[in-house]
């Protein structure tokens, strides 16, 4: 009887492991690019941008915002962006950074801002919209890709 109970127990344990959903561990990418290296804080991003002479790409978003989620999906699926992003210090935040330089044209999400290694916020790399200049829709993903390229060119020509 004891052998039968042990066998039944091990069968139940094995079945539960087999049926359990495989979950990816939560990373700093929050789904924006799991194969990319992301920093945890704005301060860390600024430090690494300056010390590694790379621009900081800051994405301000919300987990409960459908526009943020749609942009995240487009960003993560765009192979060119994922490759080019390796040339940046990457940070995505779900809170509003307190740096007044990042406010630019107000508080909204999603907002994508570039900061160069001299710690200057690049207000000259906006999205397509006049009311929320630093927001992008999934349809604007190629415009974001072009702005990423411009940020790297500015790095080489201005700094």
Curated annotation (Swiss-Prot):
GO terms for cellular component: endoplasmic reticulum; extracellular region. One of its GO terms (biological process) is positive regulation of cell-substrate adhesion. Residues 1-20 form the signal peptide. SUPFAM superfamilies: Thioredoxin-like. Pfam families: Thioredoxin_7. Keywords: Endoplasmic reticulum, Secreted, Signal. GO terms for molecular function: dystroglycan binding; identical protein binding. It is found in: Secreted; Endoplasmic reticulum. It comes from the Eukaryota. Expression begins at the end of gastrulation within the anterior ectoderm and by the end of neurulation is located within the cement gland placode. At stage 32 (tailbud), expressed in the cells surrounding the cement gland and in the otic vesicle. In addition, at the end of neurulation and afterwards, expressed within the notochord. A motif (Homodimer stabilization) lies at residues 29-38, 44-51. Monomer and homodimer. Belongs to the AGR family. This is Anterior gradient protein 2-A. It comes from Xenopus laevis (African clawed frog). The lineage of its organism: Eukaryota, Metazoa, Chordata, Craniata, Vertebrata.
